[in-house]
Amino acid sequence: MAGENHQWQGSILYNMLMSAKQTRAAPEAPETRLVDQCWGCSCGDEPGVGREGLLGGRNVALLYRCCFCGKDHPRQGSILYSMLTSAKQTYATPKAPEATLGPCWGCSCGSDPGVGRTGLPGGRPVALLYRCCFCGEDHPRQGSILYSLLTSAKQTHVAPAAPEARPGGAWWDRSYFAQKPGGREALPGGRATALLYRCCFCGEDHPQQGSTLYCMPTSTNQAQAAPEERPRAPWWDASSGALRPVALKNPQVVCEAASAGLLKTLRFVKYLPCFQVLPLDQQLVLVRNCWASLLMLELAQDRLQFETVEVSEPSMLQKILTTRRRETGGNEPLPVPTLQPHLAPPAEARKVPSASQVQAIKCFLSKCWSLNISTKEYAYLKGTVLFNRDVPGLQCVKYIQGLQWGTQQILSEHTRMTHQGPHDRFIELNSALFLLRFINANVIAELFFRPIIGTVSMDDMMLEMLCTKI
């Protein structure tokens, strides 16, 4: 057919059919191509049957027409085919690891080798390389930072070494592994091991029971450090002398000022229209409950200042004799019993104000003075204290609750109009009322009124002042 003149010879269809025939000679030395490799297909990745060589033993190179660029390429010569087959694992002889400046934050896709891939049949060690799905480079198995972070919680057994001196002391980490896990105290060969754990605070490995929190003494039997100079105890601490009895330095002047303040307080309460409509028994219930708090607000408004001095406490024998004489009328001689020093009654039972109780009064006065409370604000605060629905024995609870709520609303509107600033004036005023909970009414009576009224009860005084015209 080739030696004959065909009518279709020279046509495009004839040339395409003839170009598919493989009529190539023995391969010659490949020439240098200036153009880049084609991103072609892998249409010639497998040679045809019987096409690997000629009958004469001459080696041939099978060329295929690329369906992308139209040129002839040897089999498996396209970049696309190389990319598709690059994910296969390649076995190579392990070499010395090179210094890596920045390991890839890749995945652990090659963390575990496949079955039967741990070594070659000849016993030669192999290094498994995997194409990282993050950076596209080949890494040995377990060589990514992400895999190291995920497996950093595993316990590593290393030989114990002498601990190095840390300049900043032990880290304040947690001793999650204070007890050694079973079966991990030593290796099978009898070598001692040290369990290291990744600290959840600083990210470093510390030996077990090496944290500062764990090393703190947990019992009184542990050795204590050298005693240092401790700061002075606060005023509410009993060891600082806060329970020592005190008295007014100028009782005559202070007691007269306190009595005048009590009269003004009762006059303010008695002539309130909303208070006058209440029955006398309900008025007495309210006044007996809050007279001390109302007096403290009045003393803060009058800016009463006082000083106290420490008094000598009577001996235990004198207290016992005085108590027995009051009970028996002082007619019978009393034996002297023996009491232990730790059985002494507290300061409230002795009816002698202590230093801590007086300090609570001074703290409230200082708080009110620091706020610069006006006359109207003092009046609203007194109304809030007076109309308390939680008083035991109160019958008209809803009426008192409405009065307290109305007083708070008026105070809130007043502070909003007079104080326009970043701080909430209403909250600051109510915080001052919170300090009244730490003041005892019996302490106020003993400190300011006992030198004047003697043994008269304060409840009787409240009843007399409500019934008489002030």
From Swiss-Prot:
The keyword Glycoprotein does not apply. Residues 1-253 are annotated as: 4 X 67 AA tandem repeats. One of its GO terms (cellular component) is ribosome. Transmembrane segments: none annotated. This is Nuclear receptor subfamily 0 group B member 1. The gene is NR0B1. Homodimer. Interacts with NR5A1, NR5A2, NR0B2 and with COPS2. Interacts with ESRRB; represses ESRRB activity at the GATA6 promoter. Nuclear receptor that lacks a DNA-binding domain and acts as a corepressor that inhibits the transcriptional activity of other nuclear receptors through heterodimeric interactions. Component of a cascade required for the development of the hypothalamic-pituitary-adrenal-gonadal axis. May also have a role in the development of the embryo and in the maintenance of embryonic stem cell pluripotency. It comes from the Eukaryota. A motif (LXXLL motif 1) lies at residues 13-17. A motif (LXXLL motif 3) lies at residues 146-150. A motif (AF-2 motif) lies at residues 461-466. Keywords: Cytoplasm, Nucleus, Receptor, Repeat, Repressor, Transcription, Transcription regulation. Homodimerization involved an interaction between amino and carboxy termini involving LXXLL motifs and steroid binding domain (AF-2 motif). Heterodimerizes with NR5A1 and NROB2 through its N-terminal LXXLL motifs. Sequence repeats lie at residues 1-67, 68-133, 134-200, 201-253. It is found in: Nucleus; Cytoplasm. One of its GO terms (biological process) is negative regulation of transcription by RNA polymerase II. A motif (LXXLL motif 2) lies at residues 80-84. Belongs to the nuclear hormone receptor family. NR0 subfamily. It holds the Pfam family NR_Repeat. One of its GO terms (molecular function) is DNA hairpin binding. Residues 215-469 form the NR LBD domain. Gene3D superfamilies: Retinoid X Receptor.
